[in-house]
Structures are given as structure tokens and as C-alpha cells.
Swiss-Prot record:
Taxonomic placement: Bacteria, Pseudomonadati, Pseudomonadota, Gammaproteobacteria, Alteromonadales
Pfam families: SfsA, SfsA_N
Coiled coil segments of this chain: none
HAMAP family: SfsA
Protein name: Sugar fermentation stimulation protein homolog
NCBIfam families (UniProt xref): sfsA (TIGR00230)
InterPro entries: SfsA, SfsA_C, SfsA_N
Domain of life: Bacteria
Length: 234
């Protein structure tokens, strides 16, 4: 996806109250920007390193700037805005990048499903095959050369795995898609050291037929795209 305008840059000072981040602009001014990430952002917060942000012209917004990208001391780029993961996945499916998800007639977003009243991120439908329910997760935690999900305990993520297993039991296709938004991650696995319950459920889901795949994003201040598959350790 090409962004409507190139991101502007600054330097990270601090993230606090989950949704707020202080940065120093390139002109030296200190400002507060919106942080569109509800996770712990473990290993993504590097004070003094470069960050990039988008700017909204919506006058109703309290904070017009939104944090989009972070740079690590090693020079890796991290996509901070988890809300972009679904759009990246949709674009990649429509463009045939995700080979495992080709061949469907229609794509819908945020469709209600499951006994726990969830909304599936992406639903693929075709008259000649079972529906395909796709849950999208953004992976940004890099530790000791591996990418991990989640970066904090996630009861919501556990619920989504149960819903996907339920779809398989009903004869549908279910896929968990990790969108890797960290340029240093080349392999993904469950973070059992952070959320052992999620890791156990992920193994159960895989055993019951939920497909688990990962695709890596190439992100810059101008555009972001999913470009290649990434191995998942189960």
C-alpha cells in the first residue's frame, strides 16, 4: 500500500498511558502523538532512535499525528500501527501474494462469526469451496533472532483461536495469519514464555486443522507491502 503522503520523522522520547508517545521533531520541537498499538510493544521502544508518523487533517482529532514506524539501534524497521496489518493482508490476498489464499470469489472484512460473538478479520467466500476464515495478527517482538507472538498475555487472542477451531469443526477453513512488521524477524513462533495458555491453544488449533502462516512486510515511510512467506515454528 502506498501512503497518501510520506511519513514525517522525529526521535522517540517516551511512550505512556498506552496510547500516547512523546517525540522530538526534526526541528527540535517536542510533541505528543497517538500510539496505535495496545500491546506491550516489548523490544519496540528505543528511546533516542528515529520514528516516523503520519499526519491527519481531521480537525476533530486531539492528536493529529500517529506513530507508524520505529527504528531499532541495529537499523531494523518496525511497523508500530497494528491497525495496518489487516489492510496489508487484504491487499496481499487481492494481489495474489499469499499463495495459500488464492482462488476465492469474494473478500469481506469484520464479519460476525462464532459462538463467542467475534468478528473475523477477513472472510473469503466462493461458490465452489468452503468459506475461509482468516484471523490476522501483527508480529513485532524480536528476541534472540526469533519473532514471537503475543508480546503480552492476550485473552482476546485465545478467544480467536477457539473461534477458528470451531469453524474447522463446522467444515469451514480457518487460517491464522501472522503479519510480520519487523524487518529483523525471519521466523515466527508462539511466545510460551509470555503467554503459555496462548501457546498451548495455538498447538491445539494447529492439531485440529487451523492453518498457521506468516508473511513478512517490507515497510518504509512511503509504502508498506507483504512480500514473502515466513516460516512458523509449531
Amino acid at each position: 500500500m502506498e501512503f497518501s503522503s510520506a511519513f514525517e520523522s522525529g526521535v522517540l522520547l517516551q511512550r505512556y498511558k498506552r496510547f500516547l508517545t512523546d517525540i522530538t521533531l526534526d526541528n527540535g520541537e517536542e510533541v505528543t502523538i497517538h500510539c496505535p498499538n495496545t500491546g506491550s510493544m516489548r523490544n519496540c521502544l528505543f528511546v533516542g532512535e528515529k520514528v516516523w508518523f503520519s499526519v491527519s487533517d481531521n480537525p476533530k482529532r486531539k492528536y493529529s499525528r500517529t506513530w507508524e514506524l520505529a527504528q531499532t539501534p541495529e537499523g531494523h524497521i518496525i511497523g508500530i500501527n497494528t491497525g495496518r496489518a489487516n489492510a496489508l493482508a487484504e491487499e496481499a490476498i487481492n494481489n495474489g501474494i499469499i499463495t495459500e489464499l488464492q482462488g476465492y470469489g469474494s473478500l469481506r472484512r469484520e464479519v460476525k462469526y462464532g459462538s463467542e460473538n467475534s468478528r473475523i478479520d477477513i472472510l473469503l467466500e466462493d461458490a465452489d469451496k468452503a468459506n475461509c476464515y482468516i484471523e490476522v495478527k501483527s508480529c513485532t517482538l524480536l528476541e534472540q533472532g526469533l519473532g514471537y507472538f503475543p508480546d503480552a498475555v492476550t485473552t482476546r487472542g485465545q478467544k480467536h483461536l477457539r473461534e477458528l477451531m470451531e469453524m474447522v469443526e463446522q467444515g469451514q477453513r480457518a487460517v491464522l495469519l501472522f503479519v510480520v512488521q519487523h524487518s529483523g524477524i525471519n521466523c515466527v513462533q508462539a511466545a510460551a514464555h509470555i503467554d503459555p495458555s496462548y501457546a498451548a491453544l495455538l498447538s491445539e488449533a494447529h492439531a485440529k486443522g487451523v492453518e498457521i502462516i506468516a508473511y513478512k512486510a517490507d515497510s518504509s515511510p512511503i509504502e508498506a507491502r507483504l512480500v514473502k512467506s515466513c516460516p512458523v515454528r509449531l
